[in-house]
From Swiss-Prot:
Any GO molecular function: lipid binding
First and last residue of the signal peptide: 1-25
Protein name: Non-specific lipid-transfer protein 6
Protein family membership: Belongs to the plant LTP family.
Keyword annotations: Disulfide bond, Lipid-binding, Signal, Transport
Species name: Lens culinaris (Lentil)
Entry function: Plant non-specific lipid-transfer proteins transfer phospholipids as well as galactolipids across membranes. May play a role in wax or cutin deposition in the cell walls of expanding epidermal cells and certain secretory tissues.
Amino acid sequence: MARGMKLACVVLVMCMVVIAPMAEGAISCGAVTSDLSPCLTYLTGGPGPSPQCCGGVKKLLAAANTTPDRQAACNCLKSAAGSITKLNTNNAAALPGKCGVDIPYKISTSTNCNTVKF
């Protein structure tokens, strides 16, 4: 548990650095990290995502309702994916579908977030 909290804090700080220069009103990495922190077990190879994880995914999708918000969320996810040791890339890419939502990009360190549109 302590390791997970430490990782979440590192991800949060990294997300803040990435998003700080973006336009005001864009979704924050803090919100993304908070919404998706229950997904950490699944993203590192655990069994299917928990109901709390899927609830966070759905909450994030609902909050990201403009192009700048979706691009900001994408950048946060991209940064977080790069900072999670032992990230299971297949689980990361499958997460939205496992939670019954559709996002227009893969959760990956190679995603070009500038192409994400609402």
